Amino acid sequence: MLQQLIPILSVIIFTALAMIVHELGHLVAARRCNVPASELALGFGPKLCGFRWGTILFNLRILPLGSFLRLDGTALAERTAPQQLLVHLGGIIFNLLVAVAAYGTIFGWLNLLIGLGNLLPFYKHDGWKCGVVIMRSLLRKKSQPAEWVFTFSGCFASLIIINAALHWFHLK
């Protein structure tokens, strides 16, 4: 029985570690751009446990379905477009670096999946945030209609990419 649980537990633990790597990438980039962060959490919902290190609260939450870094949104919005892109891409960069370093291992593959998955322009994901920063920079202002068009077309494009990837893996 325990032998059957070990691979499942390994994937769960390595996925959690890859999510932490992702958020640490955002944290390092935010620190580099002087954007304050108040919380790094693994999971969502009520807090199970946590600790404070410096100004940041590190929390484990009850629903382990993701992770997040709580940044000062006002401070981030005041940064230049390249700085905002660096903060939004920080997690992806860390995941891809770890994927290369851990090439051929389950941890490497999980980091690759999380990094590439976050590049997709789904609403509120890193790829979407980068697209909005680039669009605002090109338009030189916020445009609600343009952001809605980008959001819907980004989600549609992401679904096409995911469908193509699943189809490709099915053919292999």
List PLM regions with ranges:
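Hydrophobic transmembrane alpha-helices and their immediate loop junctions
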Residues: M1-K172
